[in-house]
Amino acid sequence: MEDIIVKKKYEFTYATIEVDGRTLYRIRALRDFGNVKKGDLGGLIEHEGNLSHDGNCWVDDNALVYGDAKAYGNARVFDNAQVYDNAHVRS
């Protein structure tokens, strides 16, 4: 069986905020996908488990995803939305 390698689509920047005792990091796109262009700044996430590198999902603007929450598929979390605890967002 062939292994599928997914190229990372974002990285963490040094811009952070504290929410509920957790450190969230602003993300930056590493490649073009969907409506996102390489270099675009996104919203803030706590860890890589919050936003899949697959699909066109993205956290944008001042949106937050943290805790055990996850955005995947083609979901877009934007404006001032907050996704946290065990919530999953998929489109």
Where are these regions (language model features)?
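Terminal amphipathic alpha-helical/low-complexity segments used for targeting or macromolecular assembly
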Residues: 1-56
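A detector of tandem-repeat and repeat-rich interaction/domain scaffolds
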Residues: 52-91
